[in-house]
Amino acid sequence: MPRHRTLENSFAFNRPTLVLVVLALVCALGLAGCTKGGGSGLHVKSPATGEKDVPVKSSYAYAVTKTFTDITGKMTTASAYNTDAANYDLDATNFAMTLDKPLTSDDQVRVMFSLIGEQGTDEKAPLKAGTYSAKADKFMKVETVGIVSRKGGADNKVWLDRGTLTGEVKVTSASADEISGEIDVSAGDTSIKGSFTAKILKRK
């Protein structure tokens, strides 16, 4: 096989070629994350989309402040990072107003979810790495999960039922500019699973 031939003849090549061979082996062993690149991908299942892979072409997240009021009237807040991931180029010019533009073809799919931060935070607080559970009471919670698809010239927006939503989002990396993680949530016959990397939008 070519791979074996390359190894057998590696010492007959010059030094740069040997370096390339070593790098190729490292990638094959998964030690350098060479296969990850900048991409990510989701697997969705719903009555509208069927079961399909959704390679993520663009993804954005933006923060708002969510307010909670308990039975005594006491108010608390938390950051809510609304996240969109799609297999087409999203328009992030004006946050939700443009991210939510109608799809233009039947093969386009957009996934949406919100990540609620810790108690006492607001839209200025950075998102923390950690687990956001669908079953959390209020904070460190994933909610408002939906899938947008298109058929017959019209968008079909399906929200996963909050009462039966299970699973979690694990944010593995979070900075001021970008968040990365894995999502695995379901409700009834609708589910979303996979990885994402979202650029954080900031208000001027």
Which residue ranges define each predicted feature?
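Sec-dependent signal peptide recognition
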Residues: 17-22
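Acidic, glycine-rich flexible loop segments
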Residues: 125-203
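N-terminal secretory signal peptides that target proteins for export/translocation
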Residues: 1-15
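An ectodomain-focused feature that recognizes extracytoplasmic/extracellular
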Residues: 35-159
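C-terminal motif of bacterial Sec signal peptides marking the signal peptidase cleavage site
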Residues: 30-33
